[in-house]
């Protein structure tokens, strides 16, 4: 297929692979294309294709046959995406919140005093 006459949207470098691109990888591997040829067609790095093939390869027939499945690769991608992104600071700051709660409600300190005292003492 000539990329000049393709009706499919071209892959933008730096973006994640779509499910349609994973299906193309599956079909091209079935047809015997090399990883570099697939990368050229999708306009992405050969290492991207290599990582995707490793991520989406399943073992069939008691591990004797390995085959790339687009659905398996996409499911692995979604599972990995759940772990990315900024982590919540709430768990790390729970101790400080207990400190403020104790001194604000029980000792009658203001929020400014709680914050400044904790900073001055270097507790947090």
UniProtKB/Swiss-Prot annotation:
GO terms for cellular component: cytosol. Keywords: Plasmid. One of its GO terms (molecular function) is transposase activity. Pfam families: HTH_38. This is Uncharacterized 14.4 kDa protein in laf 3'region. GO terms for biological process: transposition. It comes from Lactobacillus acidophilus. It comes from the Bacteria. InterPro entries: Homeodomain-like_sf (IPR009057), IS30-like_HTH (IPR025246), Transposase-Integrase (IPR051917). SUPFAM superfamilies: Homeodomain-like. PANTHER family: TRANSPOSASE, TRANSPOSASE INSI FOR INSERTION SEQUENCE ELEMENT IS30A-RELATED.
